[in-house]
A protein has these predicted regions:
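Substrate-binding groove/exosite segments of carbohydrate-active enzymes
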Residues: 2-42, 50-54
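Helix-loop segments that flank and shape redox-cofactor active sites
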Residues: 32-55, 124-141
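Hydrophobic stripe of amphipathic alpha-helices that form coiled-coil interfaces
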Residues: 44, 67, 74, 159-162, ...
C-alpha cells in the first residue's frame, strides 16, 4: 500500500497573523456587500434585479459568516467572531463610495459599482491569497475561499448579464 505524495508546498507568503488579518478584511467586505445590496433592494424598481439581489445578499451573508467562524481557528480568540476590519482607510472609503448611489434611477450605477468593480477586486484578492498562502497549514482557509470564489464568480456573471440587459 503506497500513500500518494502530497504535492502541496509547505510554507507560504502569509503567517497565521497575516492570514487572520486577511480573513477579517474579507469578512468586512462581505458584510458591507451584504448590507449595501440589502439596503438597495427597496430602492431598485426592476423586480428581476430585486429578486436576484435577494439571493446574492443571502450568499454574501453566508460568506461573511463562514469567514467569521474561521477567525477563532486562527487563534484570534472568541471575540474575533464579532470582529471584521477594513484592510485600510482607502478600502473603507471605497466601500462608502460604492454604497453612495441610493436613488431608484441609479440601478446601473449600483450594479456596476458592485459587480464590475468591487466583486472583481475581491475575486482577485481571494484567488491571490489562495495561491500564496501555505497550502498545507492553511488548507482550511483555502477550502473556505474556494466556496467564496465560486459564489463571487457567479455573482459577477449575474451582474454582467443584468447590466447588458439594462443598458440595451
Amino acid at each position: 500500500f503506497e500513500v500518494p505524495a502530497d504535492l502541496r508546498e509547505l510554507y507560504g507568503r502569509y503567517d497565521v497573523e497575516a492570514i487572520a488579518r486577511r480573513v477579517r478584511n474579507f469578512r468586512y467586505a462581505e458584510e458591507w456587500t451584504t448590507m449595501l445590496l440589502g439596503g438597495w433592494i427597496a430602492t431598485i424598481p426592476e423586480v428581476p434585479v430585486k429578486t436576484g439581489l435577494g439571493k446574492i445578499v443571502w450568499e454574501c451573508a453566508q460568506s461573511a459568516d463562514v469567514l467569521g467562524r474561521r477567525l477563532p481557528e486562527l487563534r484570534c480568540g472568541r471575540r474575533a467572531i464579532e470582529a471584521s476590519q477594513a484592510a485600510n482607510d482607502g478600502f473603507a472609503s471605497f466601500i462608502q463610495e460604492v454604497a453612495d448611489p441610493e436613488t431608484p434611477d441609479l440601478t446601473i450605477e449600483k450594479i456596476a459599482g458592485v459587480f464590475e468593480v468591487l466583486k472583481p477586486h475581491l475575486l482577485a484578492v481571494y484567488e491571490r491569497t489562495m495561491r500564496e498562502t501555505d497550502q498545507i497549514c492553511d488548507a482550511p482557509t483555502i477550502e473556505l475561499l474556494e466556496d467564496v470564489v465560486r459564489r463571487t464568480r457567479k455573482h459577477i456573471a449575474w451582474g454582467e448579464e443584468v447590466l447588458d440587459r439594462l443598458c440595451d
